[in-house]
């Protein structure tokens, strides 16, 4: 079995195959595992926070299935993940409007990528890109469907699934200019959808925020994600109520961040 992609899906697939004694190999386009469970190390920022990790992709994860709960329990025992919070704030375009309780969200002190790195620590992963389907192997395409269709043309029907882009903007400040919070869902705002207190999420209480831009705004700036940084700063200042500028910022583009609409009639053997 050939597994294309070393995000959490690809690594989980590999672990399941290994447990069943099925031979496999993993090929990953990037140098590091994780996919959209991504973290970035701050470098050359001119701040005291060089070496610090930001979560630039998935913000957290929740547990709803008992089988996954057993995996998370092992990760927690190993110190890889920690319970974070079950309460987030919500805001509108003018500011924070209230709080909402939901399922427990889990964080990873070493960055959410460290979860996948831990799971993959004893797997052999080849770096490279699959450009055509090997005829002698079964294939697991563990990637967004538009990318899968490029590798495997018979999966072109799956490329009809609609995916939203997101640009995430990471920011560092000289100190926290905001009251305590973990995360804020921003509703009915044309520019941003989410603000994470990365200092609370990481557990180091650093004056660090991560903002997710709206899909529509992100789609217009995929060619140069840095263009949205001033917009993100202005919205954060408005919602959190301060005027200070960040000492460092960085924008990351996710062209295929999440699916919002899938194909309804896949060919036999293809499942989203």
Stretch-by-stretch model annotation:
Residues 60-66, 89-118, 222-231:
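Short beta-strand to alpha-helix junction loop
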Residues 34, 49-51, 137-185, 242-244:
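Central helical "cap/lid" subdomain
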Residues 32, 56, 206-272:
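Conserved flavin/dinucleotide-binding core of flavoenzymes
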Residues 126-135:
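A conserved short coil-to-beta-strand element within the FAD-binding core of flavoproteins
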């Amino acid at each position: 079995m050939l597994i294309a992609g070393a995000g959490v899906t690809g690594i989980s697939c590999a672990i399941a195959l290994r447990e069943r004694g099925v031979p496999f190999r993993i090929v990953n386009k990037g140098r590091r595992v994780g996919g959209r469970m991504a973290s970035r190390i701050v470098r050359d920022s001119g701040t005291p926070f060089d070496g610090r990790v930001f979560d630039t992709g998935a913000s957290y994860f929740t547990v709803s299935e008992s089988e996954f709960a057993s995996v998370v329990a092992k990760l927690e025992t190993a110190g890889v993940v920690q319970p974070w919070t079950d309460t987030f704030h919500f805001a509108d375009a003018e500011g924070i409007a209230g709080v909402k309780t939901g399922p427990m969200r889990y964080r990873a002190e070493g960055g959410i990528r460290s979860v996948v790195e831990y799971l993959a620590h004893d797997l052999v992963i080849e770096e490279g890109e699959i450009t055509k389907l090997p005829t002698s192997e079964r294939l697991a395409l563990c990637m967004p469907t538009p990318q899968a269709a490029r590798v495997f043309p018979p999966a072109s029907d799956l490329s009809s699934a609609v995916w939203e882009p997101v640009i995430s903007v990471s920011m560092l400040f000289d100190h926290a200019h905001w009251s305590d919070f973990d995360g804020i869902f921003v509703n009915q705002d044309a520019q941003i959808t989410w603000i994470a207190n990365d200092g609370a999420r990481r557990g180091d209480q650093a004056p660090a925020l991560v903002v997710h831009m709206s899909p529509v705004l992100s789609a217009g700036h995929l060619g140069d994600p840095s263009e949205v940084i001033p917009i993100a700063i202005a919205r954060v200042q408005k919602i959190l109520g301060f005027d200070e500028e960040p000492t460092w910022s960085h924008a990351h583009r996710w062209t295929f961040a999440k699916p919002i609409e899938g194909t309804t009639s896949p060919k036999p053997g293809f499942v989203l």
